[in-house]
Amino acid sequence: MKINRKWKIMAVVLMLFMLTGCSTDFSEIAMDTSLSKVMETGGLFEAILIWPLAQAINYLANWTGSVFWGIVLVTVVINVALVLLTFKSNLQMQKMNTIQPELQKIQKKYEGRDDQASQMRMSNEMQALYKKYDINPLGSLIAPFLQFPILIAMYSAVRRSSAVLNGTFLGYTLALTPKEAFVNKDWPLLVIYVAMILCQLVSVLMPQLINKIKAKKEAEKHHKHYEEPKNPNAMITYGMVIFIAFIMISWPTALSLYYCISSVVNIIKTIVMQIIADKQAEK
């Protein structure tokens, strides 16, 4: 119940971030646009996140000679920084994914038993499981909390960066949306959009794939037949990817590039975190 309340609080805060990010103006941020000017015309959110991101894209695009690589480098730096800042939270999240089969067994055990005593026993068993693996359920919420405002800031940054507005990739401007690219038959931009969807799908399915591989190995170890459990969150998982694809089709392709690279970094992070979690579990 505490977790549900925590999610509700986070949802309200994240919505405020979204409204703040979406309410900003989209005037161009060039290399010579000062922080003080942004502070005068915008607000704290723009000064802290949007201006630095836009200027980082401008600088790196100028340095590499390509707005494509400018966005890629900014994305990698952002994601590596987030991984370092939220290392413990990511580790908690990975552990939570690892124990999902055991949690589902407990929930299935008490399925249909809504009396207070049964719910209390289920809660105690789940708490014992968290304690066994040294997991704080709320600790896994920090990483998503930090990532969302960055995404909103990046949305504004790519719409205002002079490098994105005036630069091109293979002769195409990344300021165009995938929807516009489809109408104009700008295929390289559509490739970025499709790659983003595929990378995002792999990213969200990676924890389940890891658990499946581990469960198969465990079954073979004990000479048992592996039965793939039903995934109660399958609709949510695929629904989230569809929702992201729907949103991104109307946002600049530069943001699809950002999300694509972020998903690749997240895939690598998931694998590394799983290795660390497995080593800790063996101790």
Q: What label would you give each PLM region?
A:
Residues 2-283:
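Helix-loop-helix
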